[in-house]
Amino acid sequence: MGSRLHVQEIQGGPPLPYEDDIRAFCKEYAELLDAHDPLRRFRDEFIVPSKKDLKRKTLFPNDETEETSDEECIYLCGNSLGLQPRSTRKYIEYYLRTWATKGVTGHFVPHDDQLLPPFVNVDEAGAKLMAPIVGALKSEVAVMGTLTANLHLLMASFYRPTRERYKIIIEGKAFPSDHYAVESQIRHHNLDPKDAMVLIESDDLDRPILDTEYILRVIDENAHSTALILLSAIQFYTGQYFDIQRITAHAQSKGILVGWDCAHAAGNVDLRLHDWNVDFAAWCTYKYLNAGPGGMAALFVHERHGRVDMEQAASGKEAFHPRFSGWWGGDKQTRFLMNNHFVPQQGAAGFQLSNPSVLDMNAVVASLELFNQTSMAEIRKKSLNLTGYLEHLLLRDPQTESSEKRPFSIITPSNPAERGAQLSIRLQPGLLDRVLESLDEDAVIIDERKPDVIRVAPAPLYNTYVEVWRFAQLFHLACDKALRGRE
């Protein structure tokens, strides 16, 4: 196949340039898509584990793995843990050098060659870079804490049950930590989750998707008794991308506050948290945002909830939205006066508790700097193409195009507007372990959700069309091998 093949610029998803082209199943086609990818340079900004790295039982090279290939693995697991940016090491080394050579003065003294401002201001640097990724004002974002801890802090502020309004609505198959957090918040207020926790459940096990109309119906049925809604922007299991704007507006019209867990959405889809009038949100940074395992999380508080009346606060009156408070959330002009009179910073920064880990912040910023070299609109555009190509290769393969021949189905919505990068693939019963074993032998990194689902998520900053093509070939072979082994 020559370069005469025309590759369109995709706007908003299908129809894709490969939709009716049998050549889409050739490696050369994927190579051409990569050649036309405006984000292809970012691949080199990340460290991709090699087959040798994965097989080696030590962190550093030894003689046992010399015969293993240096070829890079196929890493399609950015929805679980993003790859390490090459710049992360440099940022952390600069932090360690500052600490080693400046000690406590590193909190306040700037340097000509610094990558981040002095320790006392690193949180501002993180918020500035994070805000455009989630469609927020800088003042609406704080990079702090961890995801579940931040959800607890936000619910402590926004879940204020009354005799009439006391329920929290959450999806029935929410990530367990979210479920635990909501349940414990309800118990903390001496309420019974059986009465105060509304679970939105799908009644179709073969299609565990929550249609927007159904969600709105559940809201209507519980409107007069609901205080808060907490939903996932993208559902971790199915990969469904909820209609944040519509659900938020509908719930708020009923007097309900709305929060979103954006763990699988931040760095994945083009969020507009401010414009969509979201009350609050929280997310981690170790998935699509590539800040490392357990990396520092972030939260969003809409500006209308973050305002502080400084005159009222100075007189000791309640002048801000209730929250759990800590010294790092205090006004910078008075933070070090130690006078025990708390006046919060304006915006989300006023929800901070302790000084942030500068070590963790460096890992966050190293990745965010890459995101800020492009835009979420461009990242989302490639993601629509990349995941659409993956879906096409899985479902339209000439060998298994008939659904009756396929030993799997895709439970993620087929509408690209209703999903992010991830496709959740449900295998026929009894195939999962065999398929995973084959993929592992071929150094393919994805993740599983028992009993029968694998999640595959091409990350547009570092994954390529050729990788997606290679995965599809290996996945079909793994399925064939698993079927033969079951006979």
Swiss-Prot record:
It catalyses: L-kynurenine + H2O = anthranilate + L-alanine + H(+); 3-hydroxy-L-kynurenine + H2O = 3-hydroxyanthranilate + L-alanine + H(+). Its EC number is 3.7.1.3. Its main location: cytoplasm. Pyridoxal 5'-phosphate binds at L147, T148, F175, P176, S177, D178, S232, D261, H264, Y286, W327, N355. Keywords: Cytoplasm, Hydrolase, Pyridine nucleotide biosynthesis, Pyridoxal phosphate. Homodimer. Belongs to the kynureninase family. The gene is bna5-1. Pathway: Amino-acid degradation; L-kynurenine degradation; L-alanine and anthranilate from L-kynurenine: step 1/1; Cofactor biosynthesis; NAD(+) biosynthesis; quinolinate from L-kynurenine: step 2/3. This is Kynureninase 1. GO terms for biological process: 'de novo' NAD biosynthetic process from L-tryptophan; anthranilate metabolic process; L-kynurenine catabolic process; L-tryptophan catabolic process to kynurenine; quinolinate biosynthetic process.
